[in-house]
Each structure stands twice: as C-alpha cells, then as structure tokens.
Amino acid sequence: MPLRLEIKRKFAQRSERVKSVDLHPTEPWILASLYSGTLCIWNYQTQTMVKSFDVTELPVRSAKFIARKQWVVAGADDMFIRVYNYNTMDKIKVFEAHADYIRCVAVHPTLPYVLSSSDDMLIKLWDWEKGWLCTQIFEGHSHYVMQVTFNPKDTNTFASASLDRTIKIWNLGSPDPNFTLDAHLKGVNCVDYFTGGDKPYLITGSDDHTAKVWDYQTKSCVQTLEGHTHNVSAVSFHPELPIIITGSEDGTVRIWHATTYRLENTLNYGLERVWAIGHIKGSRRVVIGYDEGSIMVKLGREIPVASMDNSGKIIWAKHNEIHTVNIKSVGADEVTDGERLPLAVKELGTCDLYPQSLKHNPNGRFVVVCGDGEYIIYTALAWRNRSFGSALEFVWSSDGEHAVRESSTKIKIFSKNFQEKKTVRPTFSAEHIFGGTLLTMCSSDFICFYDWAECRLIRRIDVTVKNLYWADSGDLVAIASDTSFYILKFNRDIVSSYFDGGKQIDEEGIEDAFELLNETNERVRTGLWVGDCFIYTNSSWRLNYCVGGEVTTMYHLDRPMYLLGYLANQSRVYLIDKEFNVIGYTLLLSLIEYKTLVMRGDLEQANEVLPSIPKEHHNSVAHFLESRGMTEDALEVATDPDYRFELAIQLGRLAVAKDIAVEAQNESKWKQLGELAMSSGKLDMAEECMRHAMDLSGLLLLYSSLGDADGMMKLAALAKEQGKNNVAFLCLFMLGQVEDCLHLLVESNRIPEAALMARSYLPSKVSEIVALWRNDLTKISPKAAESLADPEEYPNLFEEWQVALSLENRAAETRGVHPPAGDYCSHADRDHTTLVDAFRIMQIEEEGRLEQGDVLDEVGEEGEDGEEEEEEDRQEESSDGRQQNVEEEAVVVDADSTDGAVLVNGNESEEQWVLTPPQE
C-alpha cells in the first residue's frame, strides 16, 4: 500500500543557478550558494532575503552553516574557502584550500573540523581552532571528488563520491581509505548516510541515471532505484521519515519508500535541473536547489505518533522503534506546570511497518499501529502482535470494537475479539472515518453517523470535518472544521425510540438525533473530553477548555504541543511535543464539575462543590459566573479586590465598593466610586470619595451645585496647594473674592489676564498690575512694554473709566454676599439690570434734566428780569429733589450671576438702593 504523505510547498524563490542548499538548525533560514558567486540566506517564514554575501565572481559550489559559531563556510571555483559571521557579516577567514575547483564542504557535527573536496582529487581536513590549519589530506581518488559526508552514527568516519565511479569510506585518523565501493557505471555525483539506527546503509547517485542503496558493512548493493532520465545529482535519506529523496538533471525530485523502495511521489516544479537537496534532523522540511531557484516543501505532519491510556502510560513510535514511559513514576513534587517531565524512557520493541498513527483501545489493553496501508494490533504491556490487516485508517469504538477503512468505498467492522462482523460499502466516497460512540464516515462536505451494531444511518450533517471527538459519556461530540468547532448533544433516547418503533429513516437520518449546543470560531489542532468539558489546543497554540460554550484559556504554549490525555487523580492534563517531551498542566476536576453543574442549572449542587475548589481558582470561577450573567454570585465568590470592586460597581453595591476602596486606597477606585455615588444621589459619599481621589473638578461641580460656600473655600485652598489653579480660580471667583483671583493670576504668571480682569472688576488695581505687566514684558520686548497704557496716565483711552471707579466701591459692598438657596424665589423675579447699566440710566436722566434746566434759564433771561430770582429758586429745588431721588435709588445684586453684577430694581415713583450681604 502507498505511503500516505502530505506534501506542502512552504517556500519558493527564483534566483541564479543554485549549487548547494542548507537549513539552519534553529532559525527559519535557508542558505543557498549560487553559480553567480553569491551566498544568500532566505527566511522561509517571511519569504524574504535576510543576508547576502558577494563571495567571488566565480561559482560557489558548496556552503554550509556552522550554527554553533554563527558562521557560514563556503568553497568556490577560485579555490578559496571563505568563512563569514552571518550575524555581523564580517569575513572571519579567507584561505586558498585547493589547486582546483572546490566541489563540497562538510562540517563535523561536534568537532571543530571542516572537510573539503575538490577537482584536484584531494580531500582535506581543516581545524578552525588551530587557525584553519590543514591537519590531514586524504588521497586515493583518480577523478574529481564531488561530495563528502560524515557518518552520523560514527562521526569518525566519512564517505566520498567521485567521478572515478567509486565510493570510498575513510577514517579521520588515517590517510588511506578503509575500503572502496565500485558503485556505478559512470561517475558518482553524490552520497548520503542513513540516519536510523537499524540499517548500516548509504545511498549514491550517478551519471548513469540511477541511485543505489548500499550496505557498508557487507559492501553489497541493497537496491537500485531506477526512474530518472538524466544524471542523478542529489540523494538523501530523510532523517525523520522512512523515505529516500533523489534529484536529477531531468528536473524531477523522486520520493521513494525507504523500506520497500517503492516510488511514492514525483515532484516537478518546472525550475529546470536539480542540483542540491537539503534537510536537517528534527524537521520534516526539505529544500531543493534548481537551475532557476529554490523550493522548500514540508513532508507529512509533525504531530508525534503517541498515545496515553487512562493510567498514565504513554507509548510512542519514533521511526520503527516503540518506546514507553509512565507518568506515575514521577512524584507529584517533581511536576511543575509547563516543565518537561523527567521520565525514564523504556524501549518496548519495534514495529514491522512505519507508524503513522498509534492509539490505545478504550480500556488500554491493546494498541493499534497504522501506516503504509496496514495496521497491527499489539498488546500494550508485552508488545505482542494480536491482529493485523489492510487499512488506510483504523478507529476504535467506545466499547472496544474497531473499524478499518480499506478504501473510499469499503469499510469493515470487527468485534472485540478481532473477528470481522460486517462489511459496509457506503454510497459516497468515504475519505475519513472516526470512532467513538458512533461510527462516523466523512466525505469532502458532509458526515454520516452510523450505529456500530447494524451500521444504520442515524444522522447526516453537512459540514466539512477535520476531526471528531466523543465525550466518554457518549452524550456529547465535538466536530472540528478548518475554522471552528461545534459541540453537539447526542439524543440517544430519541434514536432508540426510532429504531424500536421501526420508523422509516430517510437519507438525512433522524432529525432530532443531534442538538447543536454551541459553535466556537477557533481551529482545533488536538482535543479531548473530560466529563462535559472539552479541552483543546488551538491554531495559536493556546491550551483552552470549553464548558457550555464558555471558552477559558488555561495556558499559552511556547511551542507546538499535542494533547495526550487527562489524569483525574492528579488533576492534570498532559501534552507532548514533536521531540517527545511530555509536559503537564493543572486543570482541577472540581472546577470542571462546578462549571458543568452551573451550566446544567443545578446551582444547589454547584454550591456544594465550590468549597472543594482551592481559593486561588475562585477568581476563575467568578469570571465564569459573570459570563453567565450571575454577577451577584460572582461577587460572593471572587477574591481579587480589583475584580470584586468592578463587580460591586457593576451591581451598584456602594458599601461593598467603599470597603474595598478603603483597603486599597487607590485613586482610580475612589474616583470611580465617587462618580457612581454622585449619579446615585449619595452626595456625602461622593464628596468623601472625591476627596480621597483628589478629584477637584468633581468637588467643584458638587459644591457649586449644592451652593456650599464653606466647601468652596476649602476646595480653593486645596486646589491652590495641589497646583490646580484653574479650580482654585473658579472657586474664588464664584465666592466673589476678586482680589484673591488677581493674586492667583499674578502668581501663575498670567499677568495680562490679571490686567483684563482688574479692568472689569477692580479698576483701582489696573495701574498696579499694568506696572507688573510692563516689567515682565520688558524682558521680552521693551517696545511692546512701552505701548501698554496706564488708565491713570491716559484715562481718555479707557471708556467710562470714572464710571468704573465710582462703581467699584459700591460693588465691593455687595461682592461676596451669597443668599441661601432657600431665598431663590424672592430673587428670581427681580429685574436683572446690571449695576453699570443702572448707573448709565441715572446719568442719562440727570443729563436730561440738566439740559431741560438750561433751556428754562435762557427763556428767563430773554423775558422778565424780575422773574430771575424766582427761576433760580425753582432750579435749586429741582436740583435738591433729583439729588434726593438718586440717593434713594434701589440697587440689587443678582444672586445667579457669577460675576457679582449689581442689579437695579425700582419704579418711576420711587427708587431705593438695596445691598446684598457680602459672600465669603
């Protein structure tokens, strides 16, 4: 059966001819040496060039990373080896290494050695700790030495490939080869070692269009791979997968099964001839160098093949080797969230096929391994073969039966004792099957659920499925798609009644068999159920759990990790990474149980469970309750003061919020509480909160609204002390303390504003402030200072200046007088004429009467002379009457005016001055 291998292109970049490629072990970098003489480092994640080195004008045929030194070493046709620091771009070393073109450089995995091979038929060993001294020369080939490579299982030996048609195996300590393989009919271009521990193999590629697999212990050819139509220029045993990769000048890359040597796939990206193949241990990425650029592909999935049973025993497959560990062997005090568990790994055995999936049955007694189109069922303890067969996919039922998908049109169901029960041929193309409570078959755009006993259709659902997870109870199922997952409830009783009643079921199945509970827009990578709680890792590598549609993030994972299982007695969920490191995280079973009971509406039972949840997890419970609209309960459960304060504010529980604010003594809390108290009409509490929060603007609003003059006085002093001059000014102004306002403006260096205010409210202070203004302005612009006019010097420039001076003393008597709010009605109906306007009216009346008197005088002079004295007496009486009326005119201060304007209130027959008491 064919090897099921996903191949995804991850990087493509056109360039000059690529002669060699290499992958960085930790950075997402590809190193490419070009025929044009340039070295390029590409980031395959961002698809951008990171570094570029102009090495020479001749071809650079080989380059490698030396990651432990942050170096790149390159050999070129100018016969020089160059070493660069890829971080600083500095050139570390340049030296002439050979007498002809340098074909290959190879870096020792642990020692400070670099091998180089050349068209001068020599291989040289260089030691960078000795200043790149040539410590050894290996002679023996009779033609160009095309490639050298270290043996990963014995780094003291290496192999060389030459156009003299041979492969030679060397020891670092000896100048002579250990042995020679007459490998091909034509020149050998490339060689690579098998990295697995079970086969002493190497592979070669030749100009005779073939690749050959050799056993270097028996010195025999194991297999010849035929299929390329031109020279084979690159060969590779993949370090992680059971495949061989060959590249040829025919433009194709062929993928062969490393065990069966069957051709699995052929890649052709249309970039002309293939010159190089690069890979790295621990990664499934493969980079290919062509005439016209580079391609990187990812082969298969990186999910580790592993399974954990309910007791904490883990079995995993690495290549064909099977290993086991037991989580219970680690003490509870040695387990820390997010840390790798120090587990003792035991070798359990080997597998006859390459495992692509591995899964325990529900009771943990058996383990199935599936791959290469076959399956084998082993006993979990002794690893004995119990059953086998053909299968593209294998799934367990919840009670120990199993099903296999042999093809898209044939599915077999087996009993608990591994006997075939039934063969099903679906009417559609079944691309996947899933086990669990029901047998599920998937096409490209829908899934169908069947019962295990009779394989009767239960329900068809139109959804594209990536994976499916059943809860242990069999009542809940999670269906994961590419972008979201759905939680469905399986109505077992409804299905049973349909079957028992013999009702007809159409092609859509039983409509009420499933009930959609919720949908979450997150991609599930791996998942499992614990009770009614669905635990999963998402596409952002966060470990989440979902209860009743409420998603909670447990941890942010720092690398890709995959769920193994949950141990209830430890209250921990376990994950594994691709390096088979096992990591545990705490997830309390009592917490899950509590949330489940709340979702079911069983609050009484939930409250009984609550005490079993440790206090440090109560905030998580409170957040959950709040999300369910149970804010009162959340306040009772929460322990974090900040969170409790937010809940108390949300509920309007001012007393609780105040107690928290008193303990915290946090300004923001006092301010927030003050605003709520103000809006709730709790003015005393609002005042207290604003004072604690130093919310002077809020206090100004409060005191001005209440008409609290004493509060305004205290606030003015506090604001001035705190440097809040705007608030202090408003307080003083509303209190009528104009002199203090002027002093505050002057102290704040707002002298122009002080002068303007004095002109309006204290004319007698204008000259004094203008003098200050001049002195201050002289420092900046003497000419501008001279242009300032003092009203004492130039009264003609100030309109009604004498009127203002006359009114100042009278206004001073009423300034600062604040009638109580209870007297508002007696003031509201009064005339709101300002003092200045009243004074103007008086002046106009006086001038009119004076003009009228002048006219009478003129008439008397032209008439009888005897009447002159009588007319004078009349004028004197009239003048005395007017003077008396003026003194009796009424003056009223407008209590609603913030500038303390004086109002005139009177009538034609009687005028009287009324002064409002001064405000303080």
Curated annotation (Swiss-Prot):
This is Coatomer subunit beta'-1. Belongs to the WD repeat COPB2 family. One of its GO terms (biological process) is intracellular protein transport. It is found in: Cytoplasm; Golgi apparatus membrane; Cytoplasmic vesicle, COPI-coated vesicle membrane. WD repeats lie at residues 13-52, 55-94, 97-136, 140-180, 183-224, 227-266, 350-392, 460-500. It holds the Pfam family WD40. The keyword Cytoplasm applies. The keyword Heme does not apply. One of its GO terms (cellular component) is COPI-coated vesicle membrane.
